[in-house]
Amino acid sequence: MRVAMMTREYPPEVYGGAGVHVTELVAQLRKLCDVDVHCMGAPRDGAYVAHPDPTLRGANAALTMLSADLNMVNNAEAATVVHSHTWYTGLAGHLASLLYGVPHVLTAHSLEPLRPWKAEQLGGGYQVSSWVERTAVEAADAVIAVSSGMRDDVLRTYPALDPDRVHVVRNGIDTTVWYPAEPGPDESVLAELGVDLNRPIVAFVGRITRQKGVAHLVAAAHRFAPDVQLVLCAGAPDTPQIAEEVSSAVQQLAQARTGVFWVREMLPTHKIREILSAATVFVCPSVYEPLGIVNLEAMACATAVVASDVGGIPEVVADGRTGLLVHYDANDTEAYEARLAEAVNSLVADPDRAREYGVAGRERCIEEFSWAHIAEQTLEIYRKVSA
């Protein structure tokens, strides 16, 4: 078996959960079968890199992406199975399946119709990305959803799909990379920021998008207990508009309270690990989240999690055992922000409970979310569609 793994992101250019998923999955699958990685971006060793057509420079981002997909198909002739991730490579997987007569497996890390704010980023290209996703999903031999909640969303959004073709394979976590870590003596990111380790720390790690709910967290932070510090590792804004909105909100928060730290660049793993490990609470305020690898990263670092109850998050964060779930209501976001603050303050006021949640979270990661198991599940789907 030879798998063509199609992805927009691959090391060293990984900025989201789908990229993390592909990176870890490939490492484990290569112990079980042959895998060729087909990705986008800068040239790199160990992968076929597909580039957009240079004559489309300046065109809508969705169109340039599709031209890269065509180049990706051209390099996948040797595959016996193609496996695409997200709409960015869905068309490549679909066309490779048609052109070479091989099965197409598609992992749905999110669904375009459930992310209408993407129209801010893509303009009319949002209609293109939605069409690509529908075409690829409905034609795929198998669709992998990263949570049971995501599987329900897939079947609701694309009712033409045969439910037997939709499988659940959750995201995982490498607990040898994500673990409780003390600040380094010489290169402590917390020391560089000026964070007081003797005061409670609330942390957020993620991109600045509507989906991730950063603005809701910043609004909630006005209600945090006075001694709480907020460390925001938030960058890569989707649009100038949301970048300005979040920047203005953080500035207002910093004027209203002390201990607000904003890291705008994407930090390396060891620095994120340090921040997560030092945090009293990690907050995931997402308004849409098929699973949320970042919650697993925080839990693996033995940190209690406060998260919204959307999508697949309840399949990761065990409410009252590894953290607290907060109900999200799109029609009453002010109440949601108040509930976020209440949950955070309850754990800050009870550090023993926060520590217990953290320990239980790491145990849950080790027992239930190994990448080796995820690779075995994925390989079984390859075998099924190839039979």
Curated annotation (Swiss-Prot):
EC number: 2.4.1.342
Mutant phenotype after disruption: Cells lacking this gene do not show a discernible effect on alpha-glucan content and do not accumulate ADP-glucose. Combined inactivation of both glgM and glgB completely blocks alpha-glucan production. Combined inactivation of both glgM and ostA accumulates ADP-glucose. In the double mutant treS-glgE, inactivation of the glgM gene fully abolishes maltose 1-phosphate (M1P) production.
Catalytic activity entry: ADP-alpha-D-glucose + alpha-D-glucose 1-phosphate = alpha-maltose 1-phosphate + ADP + H(+)
Family per record: Belongs to the glycosyltransferase group 1 family.
Function: Involved in the biosynthesis of the maltose-1-phosphate (M1P) building block required for alpha-glucan production by the key enzyme GlgE. Catalyzes the formation of an alpha-1,4 linkage between glucose from ADP-glucose and glucose 1-phosphate (G1P) to yield maltose-1-phosphate (M1P).
Enzyme class at the top of the EC tree: transferase
Protein name: Alpha-maltose-1-phosphate synthase
Pathway(s) the chain acts in: Glycan biosynthesis; glycogen biosynthesis
Pfam name, any one: Glyco_transf_4
InterPro entries: Glyco_trans_1 (IPR001296), Glyco_trans_4-like_N (IPR028098), M1P_synthase (IPR011875)
Note: Maltose-1-phosphate (M1P) is generated by two alternative routes: the TreS-Pep2 branch and the GlgC-GlgM branch, however it seems that the GlgC-GlgM branch provides most of M1P for the GlgE pathway in M.smegmatis.
GO molecular function: glycosyltransferase activity
Keywords: Carbohydrate metabolism, Glycosyltransferase, Transferase
Superkingdom: Bacteria
Single GO biological process annotation from the record: glycogen biosynthetic process
Organism: Mycolicibacterium smegmatis (strain ATCC 700084 / mc(2)155)
